[in-house]
């Protein structure tokens, strides 16, 4: 049976702390790992891995994959798409594009899908990981810019900034939210970031290995990654990039108010967790 037929969208229980949810979560990850091994039994990534978590993006992801570089300098670039459940043909589009594909049988959330990707990156030879969205808002051809601070040894973690670059969207409320939450996050982690919610990021694999056990957010995880990395002393910088409108379809992150409340929740919960953890280590 084809992968897109086997893996249909299911809804897990709402109570994230429920034992049944945790068990289904583990089974879903085990299923995805098995799926990856069946598709790619001898997988070996290039030094640079472009990692995309995708949920029902069959209309958009093909254009992103078409523009993906295969070499940056003398470094080979591999691409891994983690399909986060869904009932469309995202997995088939990725497979047809010839990239590494891993399919979750249920929708766990972007954060959970990316954590799975981080694990696969470490296990299959990647030295640098670049995350970007499946909807066309991040330009894959800007990946050399995102890797530059890692390659020259000046940073461990790079975040793209639409405020330092160009924002081609017209949502003034979302733009104001970007500035507000960057200000809040900077106050917490003593950074000078301008676009902390941007999903276009690059990492040294050593950083991901260090912070991965401390990441718990299944969705709206971008703030959690910044706070966790900063609290553990990793060097963070930013690079100017172009932020494009979605290629097609509505955002999967919800409306501005919902997104803002969820993002604030993640900032607060992560800050409290990191603060308590630091006190206990003392």
Segments (PLM) and residue ranges:
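Hydrophobic helical membrane-anchoring modules
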Residues: 1-46, 190, 214-282
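Short, structured coil segments at secondary-structure junctions
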Residues: 96-98, 232
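Short beta-strand/loop segment that forms part of the nucleotide-sugar
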Residues: 52, 76-86, 102
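Short, acidic, metal-binding catalytic loop of nucleotide-sugar glycosyltransferases
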Residues: 66-76
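A conserved acidic beta->alpha catalytic loop
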Residues: 83-91, 136
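Active-site beta-to-alpha loop of glycosyltransferases that engages the nucleotide-sugar donor
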Residues: 52-66, 85
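Acceptor/aglycone-binding surface of glycosyltransferases and processive sugar-polymer synthases
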Residues: 100, 104-123, 128, 140-219, ...
């Amino acid at each position: 049976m084809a992968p897109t037929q086997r893996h249909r969208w299911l809804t897990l229980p709402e109570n994230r702390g429920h034992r049944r949810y945790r068990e289904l979560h583990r089974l879903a990850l085990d299923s995805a790992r098995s799926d990856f091994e069946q598709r790619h039994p001898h997988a070996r990534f290039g030094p640079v891995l472009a990692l995309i978590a995708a949920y029902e993006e069959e209309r958009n992801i093909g254009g992103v994959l078409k523009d993906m570089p295969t070499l940056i300098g003398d470094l080979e670039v591999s691409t891994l798409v983690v399909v986060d459940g869904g009932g469309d043909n995202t997995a088939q589009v990725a497979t047809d594009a010839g990239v590494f594909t891993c399919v979750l049988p249920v929708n766990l959330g972007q954060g959970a899908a990316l954590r799975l990707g981080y694990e696969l990156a470490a296990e299959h030879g990647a030295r640098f990981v670049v995350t970007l969205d499946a909807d066309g808002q991040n330009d894959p051809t800007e990946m050399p810019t995102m890797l530059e601070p890692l390659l020259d040894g000046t940073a461990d973690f790079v975040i793209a900034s639409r405020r330092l670059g160009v924002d081609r969207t017209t949502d003034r409320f979302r733009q104001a939210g970007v500035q507000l939450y960057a200000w809040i996050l900077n106050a917490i982690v003593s950074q000078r970031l301008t676009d902390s919610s941007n999903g276009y990021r690059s990492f040294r694999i050593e950083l991901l290995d260090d912070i991965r056990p401390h990441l718990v957010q299944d969705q709206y995880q971008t703030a959690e990654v910044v706070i966790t990395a900063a609290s553990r002393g990793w060097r963070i910088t930013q690079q100017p990039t172009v932020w494009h409108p979605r290629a097609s379809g509505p955002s999967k992150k919800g409306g501005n108010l919902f997104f803002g409340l969820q993002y604030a929740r993640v900032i607060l919960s992560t800050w409290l967790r990191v603060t308590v953890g630091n006190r206990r280590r003392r």
